[in-house]
Amino acid sequence: MPGQYAQSWLDWEAQSGGRSVLHGTPDEIKAMYAGLSQALKPMAPPFSENVDVTEGDVDGIKYRIYKLKGERGPLPIAFNTHGGGWMVGDLDTDHLLCGVIAEHTKSVVVNVDYRLTPDVAYPVPLEDSLKVYKWAAANASSFGGDPDKFYTIGGSAGGALALQIANKIKKDPQLKDGLKGVVALVPATTHWEAVPEKYKSKYKAVEDNKTGVPIIDGESMEIFFKYAKVDPSDPDTFTLLAEDNHKNFPPTYFASCEFDPLRDDAYVMEAALKEAGVPTKHDHYPGMPHYFWLIPTVPESKIFVENLLQGIGWILSQMKGATRSSYI
């Protein structure tokens, strides 16, 4: 059973006027998210002056590219998909984090603005992301990227996408060898209606955190899944079910949080990949809720970023011809 919230989180809630959980209609959730984003802006650190940002689109799907000034490349390519339940979020969601990754791991970061529910349903967010990924692979030299050193990265719904993209790309004869890693932060990997029997005893978080935990709870996930119109038994959406392809996944870094309905999604996916012989690394954050690093003033957010950079360093160190010290 879950333990106690970190005091730093409780202090933040007290300062900010109480606990926020994303519930309601899509319009209500979008309004709550916009309000939270505005409230957090004054707390955010400035964007690095050492990173150049360019923008473009692929058939109307917008992207941003982040690159450390003075780096000619070719550099590893971090392909980022933002979180938000496939319902909220945009290129600004992970803007600061993309800059940090570009500056401190010497990766060129491609950040994707896939379309959102309820205007579209699944698999459109995945299809949009794959379209930009394939463009990036074909045009890597134009932005200093190395098409043989891709890794996907994302949090929550974006973490699900990072794994979904990997599952798809590892089946593509032309692209499969270029994908070398996955960074899956508090990802959705299975649906509670279709958890494989061998993992059911380990999959308790959605009940432990069904109501009242911060940011999202189990009821929030019901809303996100409803409007995404996901099929609980689809392995292209829920990659825990893509068992035949697990052995082909690249090294994967996970992060999970205690008070999170998706906590065990990371644990069961890691167990499945380990069983298939895939190297994994996992940082868990006791006492913290889903996606807590959104709040920059919570001390654990700095620890999260430090661990994330180490996790990316671990991914990069396993790429052919690389050493960890080459990147961080």
Curated annotation (Swiss-Prot):
Pathway connected to this protein: Mycotoxin biosynthesis
Superkingdom of the source species: Eukaryota
Record organism: Dothistroma septosporum (strain NZE10 / CBS 128990)
Motif (Involved in the stabilization of the negatively charged intermediate by the formation of the oxyanion hole): 82-84
SUPFAM superfamilies xref list: alpha/beta-Hydrolases
Entry-linked InterPro entries: AB_hydrolase_3, AB_hydrolase_fold, GDXG_lipolytic_enzyme
Name this polypeptide is given: Versiconal hemiacetal acetate esterase
Active-site residues, record numbering mapped to chain: 156, 260, 290
Transmembrane segments: none
Keywords: Hydrolase
Gene induction: Expression is positively regulated by the dothistromin-specific transcription factor aflR.
Pfam families cross-referenced by the UniProt entry: Abhydrolase_3
Record keyword Hydrolase present: yes
E.C. number(s) listed in UniProt: 3.1.1.94
Class of the enzyme per the UniProt entry, highest EC level: hydrolase
